[in-house]
């Protein structure tokens, strides 16, 4: 790789690291090309991305970013999964690691907080931002629906009492 190409690669990686919400580092030694393509496809569907670069260039790109703490994890054949959603990259990485034993998660970073493997697994078990938003909307709508039911209930009761009284009058 020429010096200019290295500089451009570092700049691109730096932009990715600067804007990412979470980064997950894993070893990928022994994975086939098809498996790596599958990982990239799954990450893309989840709104995340996968980067494979020289560790030395990645360490340079990490400088001045929140995720600089993952630098010590960059040893050997590593892949870095990033996403803005704090759950997307960890969730896909954990699922992929379960299916492929050669994909070993080393740790990660969420903002300036360095994560170990257990923390990445815990993060992956959380619901995504979209799921949380859906639940929040449901919780907000539930009281309004209940209030509408309560407001209509007295009128319905009065109607049933009148209907019952009318039924008695016809029976007599």
From Swiss-Prot:
SUPFAM superfamilies for the chain: Ribosomal protein L10-like
Keywords: Ribonucleoprotein, Ribosomal protein, RNA-binding, rRNA-binding
Family annotation (Pfam families): Ribosomal_L10
Keyword Metal-binding: no
GO cellular component terms, A-Z: large ribosomal subunit
Domain of life: Bacteria
Cysteines engaged in disulfide bonds, as pairs: none
CDD domains: Ribosomal_L10
Gene3D superfamilies with a match to the protein in the record: 3.30.70.1730, 6.10.250.290
Gene Ontology BP annotations: translation
InterPro entries hit by this protein: Ribosomal_uL10, Ribosomal_uL10-like_sf, Ribosomal_uL10_bac, Ribosomal_uL10_bac_type, Ribosomal_uL10_CS_bac
One GO molecular-function entry: large ribosomal subunit rRNA binding
NCBIfam families: PRK00099.1-1
Role: Forms part of the ribosomal stalk, playing a central role in the interaction of the ribosome with GTP-bound translation factors.
Stated family: Belongs to the universal ribosomal protein uL10 family.
Subunit structure of this chain's protein: Part of the ribosomal stalk of the 50S ribosomal subunit. The N-terminus interacts with L11 and the large rRNA to form the base of the stalk. The C-terminus forms an elongated spine to which L12 dimers bind in a sequential fashion forming a multimeric L10(L12)X complex.
Name of the protein described by the UniProt record: Large ribosomal subunit protein uL10
Organism of origin: Bradyrhizobium sp. (strain ORS 278)
Gene that encodes it: rplJ
